[in-house]
């Protein structure tokens, strides 16, 4: 999965997919009542990027729905996965469940169109704080109560705080999550970061009793870093430059080992090295 980083304006969806992304990451900010409000990152962000592009969250979802619905004039067949980077650190721990419910409601109405030919992309909810595990339980309740439990087949999870892998496992246990787990590791492209924790995550994925299904590394812009991440066995790379990642994947060392995921590839299925 080539994951376009910080895609917060509808116009950027086409821009990143046309550069080679088959997945995008979108920031979601919340208001003080735990309603998802804007697709917005804010300052500071990555080196070489504008940090302040945004849309109202529901408006962005409507644009995203068009981009991921076959037959729509804006349809992008390659776009198969969306990571919502939930900026939930602004919330109190006791608001996490509400935030999850409200987020699910918003997706149900504006993206899934209440189960009536909505967008088809797989969704990963990426949460920065382990203490906000109730965001997941709140989210999961909503499609059930609204009569569309099948939509949860399209939803996966990620804790993005670079926490100890054992602590991440405990948070999922509390949230009642078994499966659909992506594990991120990384740092802003302005700073270097080694691959030690990525390798730990890959080892968990590849072990017989691991809880991780997929591992992705962020935010990568250099060819050398891309090669290092691929050599470590990641499933996804988040980048500001999808064309760079696509270039490296076409090198002879990688093109026989990796291919770009399509809609037919199940993002919750573990593919071991």
Swiss-Prot record:
Species annotation: Loxosceles deserta
Catalysed reactions, semicolon-separated: an N-(acyl)-sphingosylphosphocholine = an N-(acyl)-sphingosyl-1,3-cyclic phosphate + choline; an N-(acyl)-sphingosylphosphoethanolamine = an N-(acyl)-sphingosyl-1,3-cyclic phosphate + ethanolamine; a 1-acyl-sn-glycero-3-phosphocholine = a 1-acyl-sn-glycero-2,3-cyclic phosphate + choline; a 1-acyl-sn-glycero-3-phosphoethanolamine = a 1-acyl-sn-glycero-2,3-cyclic phosphate + ethanolamine
Annotated localization: Secreted
GO cellular component: extracellular region
Designated name of the protein: Dermonecrotic toxin LdSicTox-alphaIB3avi
Cofactor: Mg(2+)
GO biological process, one term: killing of cells of another organism
Chief place where the protein resides: secreted
Tissues where this protein is expressed: Expressed by the venom gland.
Cited function: Dermonecrotic toxins cleave the phosphodiester linkage between the phosphate and headgroup of certain phospholipids (sphingolipid and lysolipid substrates), forming an alcohol (often choline) and a cyclic phosphate. This toxin acts on sphingomyelin (SM). It may also act on ceramide phosphoethanolamine (CPE), lysophosphatidylcholine (LPC) and lysophosphatidylethanolamine (LPE), but not on lysophosphatidylserine (LPS), and lysophosphatidylglycerol (LPG). It acts by transphosphatidylation, releasing exclusively cyclic phosphate products as second products.
Residues the record marks as active site: 5, 41 (nucleophile)
Binding positions for Mg(2+) per the UniProt entry: 25, 27, 85
